[in-house]
């Protein structure tokens, strides 16, 4: 599964501080020479790679990033203070483009990697700089140069091996938290997941990436709800994991919920509907041993599903180790 998230922002590096026009004026030195100091440099703007981010959503709300200007110089040859540089954190895997030239500025690969994207302006020169044997009282100064201003495009691409299917609030976010390092927000209401949540699942010394896409609803194949914006991403997964809540909080029928998801996949694309998958039946911890098999068989009969089934609890981890082993096996079989 390849997620492509994008954002456009404007960055403005700081302007250099102006040089000072000044002359030394002391009690016993009425005609002192120039003493105007240089200004400070403007702040650069850097991007820094940070683990733990998986979308560019925050850049849809904040689109302007501006570094501070350098301070002007002053008398007694005092230089203005240079501005602090501005560092903007972005997710690993993000490509950085100059939108005006289409130039690829760089790609964020490693945690805490630094990329300079806009240089601050150079400091202005005070009149002391222009003193010479010919001109002992120069009145010339220079302003600080402007900082770089760029229109920046950010593009984040992340590949996932397993895509999670399920109705809203089926327990997918809880499951991905249980078996991976993801920190997806979890609450007891539909549409908990509003953005793709990705987690790295480890099994001995191997790793796969699992993607929890927003829960599907009826007519998602027509764009209803969160629609086919996320359905289309399922094409590039190696396999799918369908999570069914055996006790939905909205009182809906687990069999109908399963069939709704399958129907939407078939309506969207037949090849997608035939993609290899596993079924995880969630909240099995709420049933006693004898009742579990009765409920599972009733679900399988109603859905006519005949593939591999895992009885799990995303909350307390019941059956999750076996599920992880099954996922790794499925991914290897479909590489």
Swiss-Prot record:
What is the required cofactor set for this protein?
Answer: Mg(2+)
Enzyme's top EC category? hydrolase
Entries under Pfam families matching the protein: GTP1_OBG, MMR_HSR1
Q: What residues bind GTP, as annotated? A: 166-173, 191-195, 212-215, 282-285, 313-315
Instruction: Return the InterPro entries for the record.
Output: G_OBG, GTP-bd, GTP-bd_Obg/CgtA, GTP1-OBG_CS, GTP1_OBG_dom, GTP1_OBG_dom_sf, OBG_GTPase, P-loop_NTPase
Tell me where it mainly resides: cytoplasm
**Residues given in the record as Mg(2+) binding sites:** 173, 193
| GO CC terms | cytoplasm
Keyword Magnesium listed: yes
Q: Which residues form a coiled coil?
A: none
**Record's keyword annotation contains GTP-binding:** yes
Q: What are the record keywords, sorted? A: Cytoplasm, GTP-binding, Hydrolase, Magnesium, Metal-binding, Nucleotide-binding
Q: Name one GO molecular function term.
A: GTPase activity
Q: Which residues form the OBG-type G domain?
A: 160-332
Q: What are the disulphide bonds in this sequence?
A: none
Instruction: State the compartments where it is located.
Output: Cytoplasm
- Start and end residues of each Obg domain: 1-159
Name any Gene Ontology BP term.
ribosome biogenesis
Q: What is its EC number?
A: 3.6.5.-
Q: What family does the database annotate?
A: Belongs to the TRAFAC class OBG-HflX-like GTPase superfamily. OBG GTPase family.
What does the UniProt function comment say about this protein?
A: An essential GTPase which binds GTP, GDP and possibly (p)ppGpp with moderate affinity, with high nucleotide exchange rates and a fairly low GTP hydrolysis rate. Plays a role in control of the cell cycle, stress response, ribosome biogenesis and in those bacteria that undergo differentiation, in morphogenesis control.
Quaternary arrangement and interactors, per the entry? Answer: Monomer.
According to UniProt, the name of this protein is: GTPase Obg
- Species of the source: Ruthia magnifica subsp. Calyptogena magnifica
The opening ranks of the lineage are: Bacteria, Pseudomonadati, Pseudomonadota, Gammaproteobacteria, Candidatus Pseudothioglobaceae
GN (gene name)? obg
